[in-house]
């Protein structure tokens, strides 16, 4: 019986066809970054960064391999056509399976970014973990920056994005998580905003790019971005602020540096009989004092809590005002209307409903730690 079974298995193995649908890495040129730009002539500029591996000779006579970045770009009608054109310029096949970044130029992002991403979602070999960002100026220019600490510009930008995610400056967003958000009629997206530093050898995170209906419509600064993410209940490992608590006087002793130890966010959406939408947004922050040059925190504890609560509440109002000015429903108020007030949502103007939402926001601060010992 065992022999018959072995013979049967052997025959099946012999008749089983092998899979020849393979992609050999030795023939692949890995794309590390993709950029989308609009030229002054209103044409589509497609750019990529690929690794450029070279050898370094050591004094001992041995060689080590290192990698740099090579930038390629072309004018095309679509991203797929652009990739086909660039494929004719290099020996090998372009492969986006290890792509790290997708960058939009500022002018390009002012148009609808969705069509440019269509090919990425359709290609089964595309990397769904790629990060996205908007670049002030042409995105392809940022690929030509020569960073001092990292030879690969793609890895440099990726490290920067990951560190600012940890510090609650930008949200953790990938091409996969963006897919559902960008098609949601009740929510708008926000993406990191990058710029080339003044010396041309560094890249800075400027803040957040606000989108309205898949088009760039406004921005938030770095500090505003952190507060927005807390208001949106998205906190990274750290969330730090430095606030002036003495009539905006510039001296060092008038500032306090804080880190969010814990937080609680409550957002309630209500609709009255006239169909007007109101939102109560309350944020409670438990803060740790990391720097206070005046020194005596316990003595000024109540005063600091009260002053900081006023400052954060005022700044929260400014952040919400900027979101409404850009018509960017990043809080997903429309999504809550669809789910819990569907009849009211059907009557709303889907283009401008967010601008007409009445917000009541309050931030309550309590300092819970101000030294090494809690």
Identify what each model region corresponds to:
Residues 2-374:
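Membrane-proximal alpha-helical signals and transmembrane carboxylates
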């Amino acid at each position: 019986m065992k022999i018959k079974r072995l013979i049967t298995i052997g025959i099946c193995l012999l008749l089983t066809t092998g899979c020849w649908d393979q992609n050999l890495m030795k023939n692949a040129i890995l794309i590390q970054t993709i950029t989308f730009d609009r030229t002054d002539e209103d044409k589509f500029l497609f750019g990529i960064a690929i690794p450029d591996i070279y050898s370094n000779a050591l004094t001992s006579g041995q060689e080590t391999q290192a990698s740099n970045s090579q930038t390629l770009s072309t004018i095309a009608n679509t991203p797929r056509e652009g990739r086909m054109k660039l494929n004719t310029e290099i020996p090998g096949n372009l492969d986006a399976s290890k792509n790290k970044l997708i960058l939009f130029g500022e002018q390009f992002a002012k148009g609808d970014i969705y069509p440019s991403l269509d090919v990425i979602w359709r290609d089964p070999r595309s990397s769904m973990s790629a990060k996205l960002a908007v670049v002030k100026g042409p995105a392809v220019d940022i690929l030509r920056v020569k960073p001092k600490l990292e030879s690969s510009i793609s890895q440099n930008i990726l490290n920067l994005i990951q560190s600012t995610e940890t510090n609650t400056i930008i949200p953790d967003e990938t091409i996969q998580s963006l897919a559902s958000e960008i098609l949601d009629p009740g929510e708008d997206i926000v993406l990191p905003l990058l710029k080339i530093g003044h010396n041309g050898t560094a890249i800075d995170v400027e803040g957040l790019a606000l989108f309205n209906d898949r088009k760039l419509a406004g921005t938030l600064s770095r500090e505003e971005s952190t507060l927005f993410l807390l208001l949106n209940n998205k906190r990274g490992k750290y969330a730090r602020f430095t606030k002036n608590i003495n009539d905006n006087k510039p001296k060092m002793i008038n500032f306090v540096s804080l880190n969010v130890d814990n937080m609680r966010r409550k957002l309630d959406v209500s609709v009255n009989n006239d169909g007007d939408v109101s939102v109560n947004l309350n944020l409670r922050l438990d803060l740790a004092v990391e720097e206070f040059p005046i020194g005596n925190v316990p003595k000024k504890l109540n005063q600091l809590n009260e002053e900081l609560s006023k400052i954060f509440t005022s700044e929260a109002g400014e952040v919400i005002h900027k979101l409404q000015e850009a018509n960017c429903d990043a809080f997903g108020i429309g999504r809550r209307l669809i789910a819990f007030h569907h009849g009211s949502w059907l009557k709303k103007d889907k283009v401008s409903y967010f601008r007409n939402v009445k917000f009541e926001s309050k931030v309550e601060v309590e300092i819970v730690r101000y030294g090494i010992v809690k």
